[in-house]
């Protein structure tokens, strides 16, 4: 039906007859000559319809935007001065000989080049939205990235094995999506939050190197970088230690970026412990492009009169300072806006000191309402530790450690990018290692797994599982890139006794272990090899590469932040017959919620 894609016609085809198929992107009538920009997934080409061919010209007069056309014509150079350097086909145009309307189109709900559309409008009309050149580029990039992952893993001896989509509900952190069983009344499958247990079982079965690009499902509150269903590049390997696994995965990520974007990432990626990342950046996925850092000053504030600082300092909280070079020029209005911003993260305020004269750490050299309530020794310590100079500003966070880390860590990113405290590097990868095994849930008064309960503790910390779980570090590693976690994994527990001990630390008793994880514990008894792995979020990786604002811009048919599909109106009601077959009865009629406003 066609000889070329529209976007692939170039000067190499001069004087050739080509047949093209595509959509009318734009039609223009200039002095009796009609110009049609014909579009397909590869791009645009300008087609010229001359009135000398009467029948063809009459058809051209009738076409409108988004009509589907088949056009045959001769490739020629554009007149001098009319070239378009933004198009691959910008040096040439096609003089139309024949035109056939393959299909007409209703008036589209919006122009494809309209950049002020709400996300609700875009997602409701997703099919039209996907015709926009940027969306076409995003999904083509997604394909290239996925294929690059596959090429590397295939070449490294990994095999692609599918794992079940209907699985058993197990506690992995987020809520499961449950699927009722028709043939087993009152029982439910769960859609997998990850293939975690199955890929471990494949290692026990001796497959050595596994990968899968697969869908995962988590019924959790959504953010800009989250979806209820997301795509994961899932990887597991046997007989490699933590260092060997991260080295192999680092090689893979460099390969994927080079193949997909032509970008050379640094080698090797730097490594940083979780404790250092939280201390210096307030985040376990720090954006290293931002040069601002947090400085620990908790010990300096224990004896000061300022209760906002001394309170947290003496009750297990944190007081952190962040030096902003040249920041004394910030206006009161700007500081007020930053104060409102940190409030989003639970901070009760944002203390600051303007450093007018760093040589005088007192009310003479420092400007702030809090200076009079801080000792000169504390102020001198702050100036020395932060390295503050005259003309700088120092922000403070004082609260529970989590609030300080979240609030000042977020302020660091916002201020850094807004005011130019950045390195200028395009990509700054970082391995974050030595995560805690557990964190304490104050509400439930119990330990929970920081990653998941199948992560191996460091060899020297196995004994701490029973005596002091809070001090136990894990053989876990995350790959952060520009402030995003793009991948995470760990060495797994391969001994049944250690796995049972971890379950006990999580308050999962022997009976519950057998009910929920008996199949895993049994498998580990039959010569399970040392194994570990990692999973990369394909949606996040592509979002970063594409420079998109949301992962919804790199997924063909995404859900909204209320976990709805505006195109198909899913989820939806089902009829009583289907419910009866599933042995389900609704306790009360549920009001149908209609998505409005922000998507």
Curated annotation (Swiss-Prot):
<feature type="binding site">
    <location>
        <position position="485"/>
    </location>
    <ligand>
        <name>ATP</name>
    </ligand>
</feature>
<keyword id="KW-0436">Ligase</keyword>
<feature type="region of interest" description="Aspartate">
    <location>
        <begin position="196"/>
        <end position="199"/>
    </location>
</feature>
<comment type="subunit">
    <text>Homodimer.</text>
</comment>
<dbReference type="InterPro" id="IPR006195">
    <property type="entry name" value="aa-tRNA-synth_II"/>
</dbReference>
<comment type="function">
    <text>Aspartyl-tRNA synthetase with relaxed tRNA specificity since it is able to aspartylate not only its cognate tRNA(Asp) but also tRNA(Asn). Reaction proceeds in two steps: L-aspartate is first activated by ATP to form Asp-AMP and then transferred to the acceptor end of tRNA(Asp/Asn).</text>
</comment>
<protein>
    <recommendedName>
        <fullName>Aspartate--tRNA(Asp/Asn) ligase</fullName>
        <ecNumber>6.1.1.23</ecNumber>
    </recommendedName>
</protein>
<keyword id="KW-0963">Cytoplasm</keyword>
<dbReference type="InterPro" id="IPR004115">
    <property type="entry name" value="GAD-like_sf"/>
</dbReference>
<dbReference type="InterPro" id="IPR004365">
    <property type="entry name" value="NA-bd_OB_tRNA"/>
</dbReference>
<feature type="site" description="Important for tRNA non-discrimination">
    <location>
        <position position="81"/>
    </location>
</feature>
<dbReference type="GO" id="GO:0005737">
    <property type="term" value="C:cytoplasm"/>
</dbReference>
<dbReference type="InterPro" id="IPR045864">
    <property type="entry name" value="aa-tRNA-synth_II/BPL/LPL"/>
</dbReference>
<dbReference type="InterPro" id="IPR002312">
    <property type="entry name" value="Asp/Asn-tRNA-synth_IIb"/>
</dbReference>
<feature type="binding site">
    <location>
        <begin position="218"/>
        <end position="220"/>
    </location>
    <ligand>
        <name>ATP</name>
    </ligand>
</feature>
<keyword id="KW-0030">Aminoacyl-tRNA synthetase</keyword>
<dbReference type="GO" id="GO:0005524">
    <property type="term" value="F:ATP binding"/>
</dbReference>
<feature type="binding site">
    <location>
        <position position="451"/>
    </location>
    <ligand>
        <name>L-aspartate</name>
    </ligand>
</feature>
<dbReference type="InterPro" id="IPR047089">
    <property type="entry name" value="Asp-tRNA-ligase_1_N"/>
</dbReference>
<dbReference type="InterPro" id="IPR012340">
    <property type="entry name" value="NA-bd_OB-fold"/>
</dbReference>
<dbReference type="GO" id="GO:0050560">
    <property type="term" value="F:aspartate-tRNA(Asn) ligase activity"/>
</dbReference>
<comment type="similarity">
    <text>Belongs to the class-II aminoacyl-tRNA synthetase family. Type 1 subfamily.</text>
</comment>
<feature type="binding site">
    <location>
        <begin position="537"/>
        <end position="540"/>
    </location>
    <ligand>
        <name>ATP</name>
    </ligand>
</feature>
<feature type="binding site">
    <location>
        <position position="172"/>
    </location>
    <ligand>
        <name>L-aspartate</name>
    </ligand>
</feature>
<dbReference type="GO" id="GO:0003676">
    <property type="term" value="F:nucleic acid binding"/>
</dbReference>
<keyword id="KW-0067">ATP-binding</keyword>
<feature type="binding site">
    <location>
        <position position="227"/>
    </location>
    <ligand>
        <name>ATP</name>
    </ligand>
</feature>
<dbReference type="Pfam" id="PF00152">
    <property type="entry name" value="tRNA-synt_2"/>
</dbReference>
<dbReference type="GO" id="GO:0004815">
    <property type="term" value="F:aspartate-tRNA ligase activity"/>
</dbReference>
<keyword id="KW-0547">Nucleotide-binding</keyword>
<keyword id="KW-0648">Protein biosynthesis</keyword>
<dbReference type="GO" id="GO:0006422">
    <property type="term" value="P:aspartyl-tRNA aminoacylation"/>
</dbReference>
<dbReference type="InterPro" id="IPR029351">
    <property type="entry name" value="GAD_dom"/>
</dbReference>
<feature type="binding site">
    <location>
        <position position="218"/>
    </location>
    <ligand>
        <name>L-aspartate</name>
    </ligand>
</feature>
<dbReference type="Pfam" id="PF02938">
    <property type="entry name" value="GAD"/>
</dbReference>
<feature type="site" description="Important for tRNA non-discrimination">
    <location>
        <position position="30"/>
    </location>
</feature>
<dbReference type="InterPro" id="IPR004364">
    <property type="entry name" value="Aa-tRNA-synt_II"/>
</dbReference>
<dbReference type="InterPro" id="IPR004524">
    <property type="entry name" value="Asp-tRNA-ligase_1"/>
</dbReference>
<dbReference type="Pfam" id="PF01336">
    <property type="entry name" value="tRNA_anti-codon"/>
</dbReference>
<dbReference type="InterPro" id="IPR047090">
    <property type="entry name" value="AspRS_core"/>
</dbReference>
<feature type="binding site">
    <location>
        <position position="492"/>
    </location>
    <ligand>
        <name>L-aspartate</name>
    </ligand>
</feature>
């Amino acid at each position: 039906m066609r000889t070329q894609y529209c976007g692939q016609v170039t000067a190499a085809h001069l004087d050739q007859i080509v047949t093209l198929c595509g959509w009318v992107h734009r039609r223009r009538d200039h002095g009796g000559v009609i110009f049609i920009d014909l579009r397909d997934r590869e791009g645009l080409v300008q087609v010229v319809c001359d009135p000398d061919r009467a029948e063809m010209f009459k058809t051209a007069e009738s076409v409108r935007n988004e009509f589907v056309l088949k056009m045959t014509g001769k490739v020629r150079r554009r007149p001098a001065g009319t070239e378009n350097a933004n198009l691959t086909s910008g040096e040439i145009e096609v003089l139309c000989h024949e035109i056939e309307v393959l299909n007409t189109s209703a008036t589209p709900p919006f122009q494809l080049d309209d950049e002020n559309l709400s996300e609700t409008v875009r997602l409701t009309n997703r099919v039209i939205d996907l015709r926009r050149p940027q969306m076409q580029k995003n999904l083509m990039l997604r394909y290239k990235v996925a294929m690059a992952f596959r090429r590397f893993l295939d070449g490294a001896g990994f095999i692609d094995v599918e794992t079940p989509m209907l699985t058993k509900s197990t506690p992995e952190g987020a809520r499961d999506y449950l699927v009722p069983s028709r043939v087993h009344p009152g029982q439910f499958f769960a859609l997998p939050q990850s293939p975690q247990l199955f890929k471990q079982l494949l290692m026990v079965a001796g497959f050595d190197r596994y990968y899968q690009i697969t869908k995962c499902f988590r019924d959790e509150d959504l953010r800009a970088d989250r979806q209820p269903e997301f795509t994961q590049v899932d990887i597991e390997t046997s007989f490699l230690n933590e260092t060997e696994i991260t080295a192999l995965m680092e090689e893979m990520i460099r390969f994927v970026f080079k193949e997909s974007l032509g970008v050379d990432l640094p080698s090797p990626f730097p490594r940083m412990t979780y404790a250092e990342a939280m201390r210096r950046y307030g985040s376990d996925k720090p954006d290293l492009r931002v040069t601002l850092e947090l400085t620990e000053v908790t010990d300096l504030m224990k004896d000061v009169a300022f209760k906002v600082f001394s309170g947290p300092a003496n009750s297990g909280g944190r007081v952190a300072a962040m030096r902003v070079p040249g920041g004394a020029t910030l206006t009161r209005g700007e500081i007020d806006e930053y104060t409102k911003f940190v409030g989003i993260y639970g901070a009760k305020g944002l203390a600051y000191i303007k450093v007018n004269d760093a040589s005088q750490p007192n009310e003479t050299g420092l400007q702030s309402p809090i200076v009079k309530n801080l000792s000169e020794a504390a102020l001198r310590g702050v100036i020395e530790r932060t390295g503050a100079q005259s003309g700088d500003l120092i922000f403070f966070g004082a609260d529970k450690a989590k609030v300080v880390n979240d609030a000042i860590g977020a302020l660091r990113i916002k201020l850094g990018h807004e005011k130019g405290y950045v390195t200028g590097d395009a990509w700054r990868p970082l391995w974050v290692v030595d995560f805690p095994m557990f964190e304490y849930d104050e509400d439930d008064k119990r330990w929970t797994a920081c990653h998941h309960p199948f992560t191996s503790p460091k060899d020297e910390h196995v004994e701490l599982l029973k005596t002091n779980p809070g001090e136990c570090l894990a053989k876990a590693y995350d790959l952060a890139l520009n402030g995003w976690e793009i991948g995470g994994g760990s060495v797994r527990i391969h001994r049944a006794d250690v796995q049972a001990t971890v379950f006990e630390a999580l308050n999962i008793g022997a009976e519950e272990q057998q009910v929920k994880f008996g199949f895993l514990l049994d498998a580990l008894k039959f010569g399970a090899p040392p194994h570990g792995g990692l999973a990369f979020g394909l949606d996040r990786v592509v979002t970063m590469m594409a420079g998109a604002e949301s992962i919804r811009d790199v997924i063909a048919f995404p859900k909204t932040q209320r976990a709805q599909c505006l195109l198909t109106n899913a989820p939806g009601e089902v009829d009583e017959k289907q419910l009866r077959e599933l042995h389900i009865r609704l306790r009360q009629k549920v009001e149908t919620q209609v998505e409005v406003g922000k998507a």
